[in-house]
């Protein structure tokens, strides 16, 4: 009997999200040019919620956020983002298995 290998993408696909429309729990603060920490978020966020737009500004789309806290830890000192937990009942719904 051989154990099949399950890809991480397949496991993450099982998660569900209840989006609180119009009330994102992460906001990028206004900036003239993105700090090194903001630019790092475009690479280190496991859910790929951060991207650089055509104007060179870092934007966040929190709908697929896994609430892991990577961005919170990275930007805590600089204050580049405002991060709070989603309202009760909203956010990621993890499905294990």
Swiss-Prot record:
<keyword id="KW-0411">Iron-sulfur</keyword>
<keyword id="KW-0813">Transport</keyword>
<dbReference type="Pfam" id="PF05187">
    <property type="entry name" value="Fer4_ETF_QO"/>
</dbReference>
<keyword id="KW-0408">Iron</keyword>
<dbReference type="InterPro" id="IPR017900">
    <property type="entry name" value="4Fe4S_Fe_S_CS"/>
</dbReference>
<protein>
    <recommendedName>
        <fullName>Ferredoxin-like protein</fullName>
    </recommendedName>
</protein>
<dbReference type="GO" id="GO:0009399">
    <property type="term" value="P:nitrogen fixation"/>
</dbReference>
<dbReference type="InterPro" id="IPR017896">
    <property type="entry name" value="4Fe4S_Fe-S-bd"/>
</dbReference>
<dbReference type="GO" id="GO:0051536">
    <property type="term" value="F:iron-sulfur cluster binding"/>
</dbReference>
<comment type="function">
    <text>Could be a 3Fe-4S cluster-containing protein.</text>
</comment>
<dbReference type="GO" id="GO:0005506">
    <property type="term" value="F:iron ion binding"/>
</dbReference>
<keyword id="KW-0249">Electron transport</keyword>
<keyword id="KW-0479">Metal-binding</keyword>
<feature type="domain" description="4Fe-4S ferredoxin-type">
    <location>
        <begin position="56"/>
        <end position="86"/>
    </location>
</feature>
<dbReference type="InterPro" id="IPR007859">
    <property type="entry name" value="ETF-QO/FixX_C"/>
</dbReference>
<keyword id="KW-0535">Nitrogen fixation</keyword>
<dbReference type="InterPro" id="IPR012206">
    <property type="entry name" value="Fd_FixX"/>
</dbReference>
<comment type="similarity">
    <text>To ferredoxins from P.putida and C.tartarivorum, ferredoxin I from A.vinelandii, ferredoxin II from D.desulfuricans.</text>
</comment>
<keyword id="KW-0614">Plasmid</keyword>
